């Protein structure tokens, strides 16, 4: 009798489990799991990465921008149709932009679900958050370029990270300018070690004062090294180069007494090679001040109402034209000319490509813009 009872009990449990399993199966069929828009974008990116791992011959060979259809991922059975991924998938469209820059590939999912959700670039978000002004602090516009000026507090971006006390901590940057849908950022921290701009023997000076020719300098090598070792203070510092645009740097020369009104002399000459990292220029620093007495790079008034003003020393890549060794550097609240063989910090600049997309934040130091 006890065996019969035990047998019936086991049978009941098995039957219950089968019914439960069948119910879960029916539930999954009639109530499929849907994802958020952000989760869907991540799924599309992962499916695209797998697609090209399986089809490496399909990767673009030349630098540029390319498109991949969402349907190609569905046909490869790497992702479900959009109406099975998103609850409103029938009203959405999706595509993938592939960007090749040197040896780096970027995969950018683009979702369009009308008013409900559309993948948004960081540039669009910044311009939506900031009305262009013509006085005081804020976002200015000149000849198609947007730039921040004054004591602004909403132009912070978190990009890259390092580990501190077993916690992932983001690097903070300030937005300097926006041009051609690309965003120039300046790091709020230095790279962790001082470098000389150039220490070669200068035959013109008969001493090891270095030369102020950027294309043949040592600082260009230091900037290039940042591509593999971004920060010497943190060994595990990470920067995603696929989000950046390699650019020819503005290396035109100017004099300490050249007035701000002369404009961006630095960009009249560009570096021979393209770089992912650069430095701020004296013109950009002067332009960021709203003090009317900021008339040239040596004006102490330039530190007033200027979000780019520092308390640390830093190199620029800008040289003077009146000698073969002088370099602009920021120190003691002003720009001065130093010999190239001097050791100073680098606060690097980068350019986010037009494919940097908004992923959260309001631009404050407490809640900086996030990108993906």
Task: Report the location of each language-model feature.
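Conserved hydrophobic/amphipathic alpha-helical signal-anchor segments
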Residues: 27, 31-66
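Long, compositionally biased
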Residues: 94-117
């Amino acid at each position: 009798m006890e065996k019969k009872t035990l047998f019936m009990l086991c049978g009941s449990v098995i039957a219950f489990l089968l019914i439960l399993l069948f119910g879960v199966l029916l539930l999954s069929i009639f109530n499929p799991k849907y994802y958020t828009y952000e989760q869907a974008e991540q799924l599309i990116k992962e499916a695209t990465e797998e697609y090209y791992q399986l089809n490496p011959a399909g990767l673009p060979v030349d630098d540029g921008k390319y498109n991949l259809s969402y349907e190609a991922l569905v046909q490869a059975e790497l992702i479900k149709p959009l109406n099975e991924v998103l609850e409103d998938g029938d009203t959405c469209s999706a595509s993938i932009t592939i960007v090749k820059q040197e040896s780096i590939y970027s995969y950018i999912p683009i979702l369009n679900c009308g008013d409900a959700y559309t993948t948004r670039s960081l540039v669009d978000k910044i311009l939506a958050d900031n009305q262009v002004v013509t006085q005081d602090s804020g976002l200015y516009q000149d000849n198609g370029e947007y730039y921040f000026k004054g004591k602004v507090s909403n132009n912070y971006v978190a990009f890259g990270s390092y580990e501190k006390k077993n916690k992932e901590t983001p690097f903070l940057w300030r937005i300097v300018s926006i041009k051609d849908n690309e965003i120039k950022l300046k790091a709020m921290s230095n790279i962790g070690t001082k470098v000389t701009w150039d220490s070669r023997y200068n035959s013109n000076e008969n001493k090891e004062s270095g030369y102020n020719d950027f294309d043949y300098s040592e600082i260009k090598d230091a900037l290039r090294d940042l591509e593999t070792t971004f920060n010497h203070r943190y060994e595990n510092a990470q920067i995603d180069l696929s989000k950046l645009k390699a650019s020819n740097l503005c290396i035109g020369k100017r004099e300490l007494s050249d007035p701000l009104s002369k404009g961006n002399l630095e960009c009249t000459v560009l570096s021979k090679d393209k770089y992912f990292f650069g430095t701020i220029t004296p013109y950009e620093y002067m332009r960021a001040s709203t003090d009317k007495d900021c008339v040239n790079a040596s004006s102490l008034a330039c530190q007033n109402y200027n979000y780019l003003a520092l308390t640390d020393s830093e190199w620029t890549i800008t040289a003077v034209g009146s000698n073969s060794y002088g370099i602009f550097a920021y120190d003691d609240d002003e720009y001065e000319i130093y010999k190239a063989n001097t050791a100073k910090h680098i606060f690097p600049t980068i350019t986010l490509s037009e494919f940097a997309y908004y992923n959260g934040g309001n631009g404050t130091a407490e809640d900086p813009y996030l990108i993906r």
